[in-house]
Design a protein with these regions (language model features):
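Alpha-helical transmembrane segments of multi-pass small-molecule/ion transporters
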Residues: 1-58, 63-287, 291-338
Length: 338
């Protein structure tokens, strides 16, 4: 894990502070950025999100899908949790906390937006950071690669229907044209671009050209994330300064969801008698979120100033320290799978 990944929470925290200060003292900058929009797509945010997502797609070798039959139990475990359990538990927790438990502190419209942001996080399984978590737990690299590749392909077809279903079920209006456009812009097109780039660059046996390209692009992916956080918290600065408790309220159900899903996945992996090299990455993949996609879709559907966008960024803030704690736990319990 590099310097940026290891201290990502610190960098995100600093970006949050910069965004809030800038939003308070130079709001005209954010008004200008917000005006650069067409068909619910903000050009500045779209460019930054592409900067985050495109390098991830280049990193993934989709030809690994041919090895899908080599780890059937681990793959089945993660796919079931990612697509049949996690989105629904996230929606349930969002509804429970913001419609009932936190109702005295959050107005109904804002509560809907927070729930929407949580749902978008729950429907987007993690992509790039999974390789880091797998490496830190000494996971099977081939299994991890196959699982991520399959998830990304499924995401093209399943993200919009599941997100639309859950948003509709929680009484949130779903602009389907914008949702489908978001999937095309932030999943399908970057995926195709990543595949073509990888095919063009990866023509040597030692992958030297591809590795050099990825080394150049990796820092820019983090820059895109941090710039996105600065902008989002700049747009949200007035709300956050007047209601700082909002971040804590959003973080609570996200923490419960993350630890709960990991516990379920890890327990099932033990029941299925998976080796630790599959159990650990399977549980990490099941637990973590593709927060870059969630942020992009939240902005497209609900706007830069929305509670949904804020909720997805809180997801970024929460995920890294939580996942590092789960890496520690997985490494300490390796003997459970002996």
């Amino acid at each position: 894990m590099g310097l940026f990944e290891r201290y990502l929470t610190v960098w995100v925290g600093m970006a949050i502070v910069v965004g809030i200060i800038a939003g308070s003292f130079a709001p005209e900058i954010f008004v200008t950025v917000a005006s650069l929009e067409y068909a619910h797509v903000n050009f500045v945010m779209a460019a930054l999100i592409w900067l985050m997502i495109y390098p991830m797609m280049v990193q993934i070798d989709f030809s690994s899908i041919k090895d899908v039959g080599k780890n059937p139990k681990g793959l089945a475990l993660t796919l079931v949790i990612n697509w049949l359990i996690k989105p629904f538990t996230m929606a349930l927790l969002g509804w429970l906390f913001f419609k009932i438990l936190f109702a005295p502190w959050v107005d109904p419209q804002t509560a809907k937006e927070y729930i929407a942001g949580m749902i978008l996080l729950g429907v987007a399984p993690c992509t790039a950071m999974v390789f880091v978590w797998s490496q830190l737990t000494k996971g099977d690299a081939n299994y991890t690669l196959v699982q991520v590749s399959i998830n990304d392909v499924i995401m093209i077809f399943a993200f919009a229907p599941i997100a639309g279903l859950l948003l509709g079920a929680t009484d949130i209006h779903v602009p389907w044209d914008t949702l489908l456009l978001s999937v095309v812009l932030y999943v399908l097109v970057p995926l195709i671009a990543g595949v073509l780039t990888r095919k063009t660059l990866d023509k040597t046996d030692d992958h030297s050209t591809l590795n050099a390209f990825l080394k150049i692009m990796k820092p820019w992916s983090i820059v895109g994330l941090l710039a996105t956080v600065v902008l989002l918290f700049g747009f949200q600065s007035e709300t956050i300064l007047s209601k700082p408790q909002a971040i804590i309220l959003i973080a609570i159900p996200l923490l419960i969801q993350t630890y709960g899903i990991f516990a379920l996945a890890y327990w099932l992996a033990k029941k299925f008698k998976l080796p630790h090299s599959e159990a650990a990455p399977a549980s990490m993949i099941a637990t973590s979120n593709f927060f870059e996609l969630a942020v992009a879709v939240a902005i497209s559907l609900f706007g830069l100033h929305s509670g949904a966008a804020l909720a997805t960024v809180v997801g970024v803030l929460v995920e890294v320290p939580v996942m590092l704690s789960l890496v520690w736990f997985a490494n300490r319990t390796r003997h459970w799978f002996a």
